[in-house]
Design a protein with these regions (language model features):
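Regulatory N- and C-terminal appendages and interdomain linkers associated
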Residues: 2-173
Length: 173
């Protein structure tokens, strides 16, 4: 009947509106996460390109993303060498670092508590960017031990480590 067709058209229009809105919603949500991972609290137009450039640099130089995000905290605290050390060519990150540092400084300078803002950025970064993630080889080792030998000890240690992803236990990085 025409009522059914009208309902279907209306439902399709509603779903289409939601689907059409999704890319913008997703991009905005992703940018909010990236700002946090970069240690930024305010919104600036260049933030998406800053995050994209960092990710492209990591990919181009085959740098471990998790470690790089984590070592931004060291850079925020004034020592970019741990981040640079992840790159085969340690100076490759320098142009991006200058942009990120300028962006952080602009945010800090706008804050009447700028000294506090600088001091807490590294802490925020360490609370946002995990050090421990479920790396494939670690999960496979735990699964192999459990399935081949019924040994859950490695699984239990991995699970315990993953329950504290922001700790600095280098055994699980």
């Amino acid at each position: 009947s025409s009522d059914d067709e009208t309902e279907v058209k209306h439902a399709v229009a509603q779903v289409t509106d939601v689907i059409d809105a999704f890319p913008a919603w997703y991009a905005d949500a992703l940018l909010q996460v990236q700002r946090a991972k970069l240690g930024l609290q305010t919104e600036q137009a260049e933030d998406a390109s800053l995050a994209d450039a960092f990710l492209a640099l990591l990919q181009q130089h085959q740098v471990d993303f998790t470690q790089a995000w984590r070592r931004l905290a060291d850079a925020a605290a004034g020592d970019a060498n741990p981040l640079r050390a992840l790159f085969a060519e340690s100076t490759a990150i320098n142009p991006w670092l200058l942009q990120w540092q300028a962006r952080c400084a602009a945010e800090d300078d706008a804050d009447p508590q700028a000294a506090t803002a600088r001091a807490v950025r590294a802490v925020r970064l360490r609370q946002t960017n995990p050090r421990i993630i479920p790396r494939n080889h670690r999960v496979e080792e735990a699964l192999a031990a459990a399935s081949a030998h019924g040994d859950l000890s490695l699984f239990n240690r991995l699970l315990a480590a993953l329950q504290q992803p922001f700790s600095d236990d280098p055994a699980w990085a």
